[in-house]
Amino acid sequence: MELDLALDREEGALQASEIGDLLDETVWLQQLEHWLQIVCGDESLDCPTLVRSAEELSLGLRFIDDATIADLNSTWRQKTGPTDVLSFAALDDAGDWMEGPSIELGDIVVSLETARRQAQEQGHSLQQELRWLVSHGLLHLLGWDHPDEKSLATMLALQERLLGDG
């Protein structure tokens, strides 16, 4: 399976010295392809059949600032203030997915400023926090959700597995 990644970054949210490989498109492409192979390759995990069988998947990954994500959070979730990650699935109902060689998954939007704060609060690197947030967003694009504590625990366990596998 091949991934077509559209990466957009507002580098102004980070100092030049902080960026390094954090916002490198090739690094994120390899990481996302690896995570998709894990989820799609394990029949015990929920993943839309059309995604499992697709020759090509496509998604957008956007790194932005708190002001921009706060606007999106207000518009799409009717919540005030910034959040860490938002996912916009191309299709929420698996029955609506169109068959074809390429499947559009949707977009993952991450606030670099919130990610930096959370990394500092958790005592780990910004890279680790970004990987956590992007993996969480990816699972949402694949249909995972956490309306209750049990489903949240299951989703977080899968995130830990993804991060542990590279």
Curated annotation (Swiss-Prot):
Entry keyword annotation includes Repeat: no
Gene Ontology CC entries for this record: cytoplasm
Biological process terms in GO annotation: rRNA processing
E.C. numbers: 3.1.-.-
UniProtKB keywords: Cytoplasm, Endonuclease, Hydrolase, Metal-binding, Nuclease, Ribosome biogenesis, rRNA processing, Zinc
Binding residues for Zn(2+): H136, H140, H146
Top-level lineage group: Bacteria
Subcellular location: Cytoplasm
Gene Ontology molecular function: metalloendopeptidase activity; RNA endonuclease activity; zinc ion binding
PROSITE patterns the UniProt entry points to: UPF0054
Cofactor: Zn(2+)
Cofactor: record remark: Binds 1 zinc ion.
Function: Single strand-specific metallo-endoribonuclease involved in late-stage 70S ribosome quality control and in maturation of the 3' terminus of the 16S rRNA.
Family to which this protein belongs: Belongs to the endoribonuclease YbeY family.
NCBIfam families (alphabetical): rRNA maturation RNase YbeY
Protein name: Endoribonuclease YbeY
Species of provenance: Synechococcus sp. (strain CC9605)
Organism placement in taxonomy: Bacteria, Bacillati, Cyanobacteriota, Cyanophyceae, Synechococcales
